[in-house]
Amino acid sequence: MLKKVATTLLVVAIPIAISLAIFQKTTIQTNTPISVAVLQPNVDPYTEKYNQKNEESLAVVQQMMAPYNMNSIDLVIAPETYFAEGAGLSLRNFETSTLYKSIDDWLSNYPKTQFVTGIQLFKTYTSEDTKTATSNLIREQLWVDFYNSAFIHPSFDENTIYHKSKLVVGVENTPYRSIIEPILGNVLLDLGGTVFTKATQEYRTSFPLIKGASIAPIICYESVYGSFVTDYVRAGATILVIMTNDAWWSNTQGHKQHLSYAKLRA
């Protein structure tokens, strides 16, 4: 009996001891430090968030950054779905939108600074032939894909937008949709859009920074999945950025658990 206990303890203790030894000898060096501003605008998601216009949300960001020297900051980070006016902005026309132009005008004063933020986007389809499996039927001959996305500006390659791809079941994703929708039909539309399925993307994306590093735009629930986060690193990410809507959790342990996951992933 004692032999079995001793063997079990050794099996557990030896890897821990090796890990601690490696940790003590490991030094993390960087020749190019990144200066980051992480914003928490503290917008109540239950009473304010979705009634606030995008231009007002941008003004809050600018006001929060006003006391700081933007020329010394490499990256400004805003929360998940921070720009969430209405149903979102059209993905097809995003770069010609008023919000995009306003962000571009703001950052043109700070050529060394990049801005990454959460945003709601959508894409419409008017034909059975072009609609996707994730698109939501809004009315006759109109289907819409909704995205919980991350956006970086300015960007220096084709990767400017990433769509959240690990969705919260029941909030962003309807399970067994092919079975449930024919049964409930338009009842789904009467729930305020809360059960609209979000669209995703197949591969992880990293956003390159001016200083040569690359960030993983991890959105909320995605951080729970270790191997999923690893895919960001395989895509070239060297910095993990986790954007969340922690205010949804109110005064619970949820936001603290999110922080613990973030430290674990790092």
What do the PLM-derived regions correspond to, one by one?
Residues 2-10:
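Membrane-interfacial entry segments at the cytosolic side of transmembrane helices
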Residues 11-112:
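Membrane-interface segments at or immediately adjacent to transmembrane helices
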Residues 78-266:
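Solvent-exposed soluble domains appended to multi-pass membrane proteins
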